[in-house]
């Protein structure tokens, strides 16, 4: 399973996205990311800031998105968004 870059990176993302994801703890945030990777739709895209290749998983039933490094070894971000976002706002998205 993919890991977060660091404890600080995980904590920062948890604090930014916890309310919208409705999770009360870091462990629930991590479990939610792992579940999204398990059940979500795989797609590829390019990072909007760095243009680096990325892998995404999106669960259209919950609106949960996880962005990973291109080798899927590192979780880079985790938040809730619309299907339209993963289709059209992420550069080069292969999500259908």
Regions found by a protein language model. Give the residues of each.
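A short, surface-exposed interaction/processing loop segment used at functional sites
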Residues: 66-96
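Basic/aromatic recognition patch in beta-strand/loop cores that engages polyanionic ligands
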Residues: 45-71
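Low-complexity, compositionally biased segments
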Residues: 12-16, 20, 50, 62, ...
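Compact soluble domain cores
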Residues: 1-54
